[in-house]
Amino acid sequence: MKQIKKAIIPAAGLGTRFLPATKAMPKEMLPILDKPTIQYIVEEASRAGIEDIIIVTGKHKRAIEDHFDNQKELEMVLEEKGKDDLLEKVQYSTDLANIFYVRQKEQKGLGHAIHTARQFIGNEPFAVLLGDDIVESETPAIKQLMNVYEETGHSVIGVQEVPESVTHRYGIIDPLEKEGRRYEVKQFVEKPKQGTAPSNLAIMGRYILTPEIFDYLETQKEGAGNEIQLTDAIERMNSDIPVYAYDFDGDRYDVGEKLGFVKTTIEYALKDPKMKDELIKFIKELGF
C-alpha cells in the first residue's frame, strides 16, 4: 500500500464573506494572531508527515506564495538586529514542506479545484485539507484519517457532529455500521435541505482520497451552486468502492466566517501566556 506523502490545499476562493478586507488580500492570509490561517493548515499537514503540498490558487493569491518563500533580505535584517525569535518564526514557515502551486482558472467548485491538481498527485492516495477549519488535536486530524486509510486501503472522510439546525450548511453522511470512530457510509449528501439530513455527522474539511476519485471528478456534473461538488463525486465513488467516514478527535475552529474568525482569534489569544492576563482584564473592563 502506498504511503500518503502529498496533500492538496484549495485556496482559490474569492473570500467574499470578508470583503472588503479580501478585495486585494487572500482570505487565507488573514491572521490569527501572528500567523496567517493557511499556515495553521500547512503545519497540520507537515506534522502528519506530508512532504509535498500543492496549493490550488487563483487571481490575487500571490501573497500566499510569497509567505512560504525564502525572504533573505528580511532574514538578514532580523539577524543583524538580534531578533532571533522572529528570525526563527520566519524561517520555520519556509521549511514546513515542499510547496507547489497550480492555478484554478475558473471558480467551478471544490471538486473542480481538486481535479486541477490531478497531474501533481498522479496515481497516489492523497490528503485534502480545507482552509476554513483549523483543528487543534494531539494527533493531527489528517493523520487520524491517514491511520484509517492504512487500516482499510480506502478513502476516508473526516466528520464531526454538528447541531441539527445547521446540517443544511454541510455535506452530511448517512452512516451504516460503526466501529469505534469509523463509519461505513450508505450515502454522502451535499448540503441537504433543512430538516432532511440523514444524520448530524458533517464533513469537516479533511479527506484522504484514493486516485480513483479523479475519474469520478472528470465526469461529475454540476451540483449545488452550479459547481462541481467533491461530495457528489465521493458519493458516486462510494457506490463502486467503499468510502469510510471517521469522527476525528479535536477542537475545530471555523475561520471561514467572521464570527468564527473572531472567536478563534480570542481563544488563541487566551492561550498565549503573553496576552492572556491583559486580554482577560480588557474583556472584564468592557462590562459584558
Curated annotation (Swiss-Prot):
Belongs to the UDPGP type 2 family. It is an enzyme of class 2 (transferase). GO terms for molecular function: UTP:glucose-1-phosphate uridylyltransferase activity. Pfam families: NTP_transferase. It comes from the Bacteria. This is UTP--glucose-1-phosphate uridylyltransferase. Catalyzes the formation of UDP-glucose from glucose-1-phosphate and UTP. This is an intermediate step in the biosynthesis of diglucosyl-diacylglycerol (Glc2-DAG), i.e. a glycolipid found in the membrane, which is also used as a membrane anchor for lipoteichoic acid (LTA). Keywords: Carbohydrate metabolism, Nucleotidyltransferase, Transferase. The lineage of its organism: Bacteria, Bacillati, Bacillota, Bacilli, Bacillales. Its EC number is 2.7.7.9. One of its GO terms (biological process) is UDP-alpha-D-glucose metabolic process. Pathway: Glycolipid metabolism; diglucosyl-diacylglycerol biosynthesis.
